[in-house]
């Protein structure tokens, strides 16, 4: 809103001797609405909006990139005040001197140099604001990020539960629903942790498509749940040929996850578990409603590790054989445990040291000795073995219940939390704070109470009694 206010009232800033911010870098993961925010800024301020992608500057001919930069800023000056938005600026803004020895690299650097000159070349009263979007701010040239070019870095993260609820409200208005949008927005926000704005739009569209395929006249909750399943797990494949032994193995594997999570204090609440094949590899999955905690304790991560190993433990204890189905679980456990030992400083043997893992694969040397690496590897194996031992013990204690859940899964294919409560009873651990799953369930309870209150009001209206007189409160 700061840039909107400047573009609407530039003289107010200039009279006070303030220099107008020349640019802002919109930083965030894909799908969070960086481009949409830039469009909204132009719409709110009512000024011309010039948009271009970083890759549009690059062509096979030498000199085209710098020429396009000059033409873009010349056009912006002619219709000032205006906004220039450069999407995916990392295509031309990558730090100079990195990677590549070809002429194409020189062309990119020439384009970047021209952009630096243009951003620092026009006067502060010209009324041009440059917005740029990227999800890789770490690779951008330092000269591009200095004050005087991009004065602001605006972080646009994935929305929290309140943000998701507001985004759902917008997209639900475009869909023909059987209830008010507010009925769904609260529940769906709780069911979609970690979803970006683009994911939410996709869920709403998928729900409408599913309703249309099922010959429905309105979109209902079951359609939204099916859409979320499809976005998370992939396309449902009921016609996939699976042997009885494989189906039984998958049922016991998923049952192990469900029961382990049920009796672990810090495990995330289970929403549902299914053995319906989805996507390219998933033969079944358990869906949880995680709380969006900003901090995690050692105990929480240990319980999460145990819950992830629940499937492998159930196969070993109840079937006596282990399968390749736990590959994805073991991958998650390995990554999680290495982070605890080598990044978060949870290991006494490694000490209070942190070696963050890089996202790219270009790190040839590690920032620690081979001896320290051996200690880290040994600690990770020891921690995973301890977590697996705890999980096997838990599955042994609840062996009969694991078998019951597995047989129910083979019969129904999909089990919700209510089905687990009938077999396992209520969870022995209750959170002192409201969880995302509590918010999801609370929405239905409030709706039931509201509908019950409406019925009571109708009964009171029809019993022939006189309406209540309004009470006058003196002021």
Model-derived features: positions:
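Soluble catalytic regions of large protease machineries
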Residues: 245-252, 258-475
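Short flexible coil/turn linkers enriched for glycine and charged/polar residues
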Residues: 20-22, 29-33, 43, 78, ...
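Walker A/P-loop NTP-binding motif of AAA+ ATPase domains
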Residues: 1-189, 195, 207
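Active-site phosphate-binding and catalytic loops of NTP-dependent enzymes
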Residues: 9-16, 124-127, 178-180, 218, ...
């Amino acid at each position: 809103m700061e840039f909107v206010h400047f573009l609407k009232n530039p003289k107010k800033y200039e009279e006070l001797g303030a220099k107008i911010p020349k640019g802002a870098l919109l930083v965030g993961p894909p799908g969070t609405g960086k481009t949409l925010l830039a469009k909204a800024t132009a719409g709110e301020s009512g000024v011309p909006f010039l948009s271009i992608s970083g890759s549009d500057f690059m062509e096979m001919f030498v000199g085209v990139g710098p020429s396009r930069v000059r033409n873009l800023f010349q056009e912006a000056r002619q219709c000032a005040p205006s906004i220039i938005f450069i999407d995916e600026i990392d295509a031309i803004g990558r730090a100079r001197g990195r990677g590549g020895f070809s002429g194409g690299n020189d062309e990119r650097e020439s384009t970047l140099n021209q952009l630096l000159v243009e951003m620092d070349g026009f006067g502060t009263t010209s009324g041009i604001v440059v917005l740029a979007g990227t999800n890789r701010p770490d690779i951008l040239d330092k000269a591009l990020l200095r004050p005087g070019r991009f004065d602001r870095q605006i972080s646009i993260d994935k929305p929290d539960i309140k943000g998701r609820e507001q985004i759902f409200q917008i997209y639900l208005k475009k869909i023909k629903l059987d209830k008010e949008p507010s009925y769904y927005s609260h529940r769906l926000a709780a069911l979609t942790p970690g979803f970006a704005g683009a994911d939410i739009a996709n869920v709403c569209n998928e729900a409408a498509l599913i309703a249309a395929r099922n010959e429905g006249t309105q979109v209902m909750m079951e359609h939204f749940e099916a859409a979320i399943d499809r976005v998370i797990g992939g396309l449902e494949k009921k016609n996939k040929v699976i042997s009885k032994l494989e189906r039984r193995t998958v049922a016991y594997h998923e049952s192990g996850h469900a029961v382990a999570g049920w009796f672990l204090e810090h495990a995330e609440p289970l929403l549902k578990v299914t053995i319906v094949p989805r996507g390219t590899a998933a033969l079944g999955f358990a869906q949880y409603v995680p709380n969006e905690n900003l901090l995690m304790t050692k105990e929480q991560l240990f319980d999460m590790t145990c819950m992830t190993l629940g499937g492998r433990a159930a196969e070993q204890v109840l079937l006596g054989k282990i399968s390749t189905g736990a590959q994805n679980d073991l991958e998650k456990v390995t990554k999680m445990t290495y982070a605890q030992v080598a990044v978060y400083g949870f290991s006494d043997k490694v000490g209070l040291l942190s070696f963050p893992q890089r996202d790219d694969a270009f790190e040839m040397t590690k920032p620690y000795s081979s001896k320290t690496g051996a200690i880290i590897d040994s600690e990770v194996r020891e921690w995973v073995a301890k977590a697996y031992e705890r999980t096997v013990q838990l599955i042994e204690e609840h062996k009969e219940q694991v078998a019951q859940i597995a047989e129910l899964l083979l019969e129904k294919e999909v089990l919700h939390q209510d089905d687990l409560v009938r077999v396992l009873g209520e969870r022995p651990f209750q959170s002192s704070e409201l969880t995302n799953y509590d918010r999801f369930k609370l929405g239905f309870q409030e709706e039931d109470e509201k509908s019950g209150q409406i019925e009571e009001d109708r009964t009171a209206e029809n019993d022939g009694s006189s309406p209540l007189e309004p009470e006058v409160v003196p002021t």
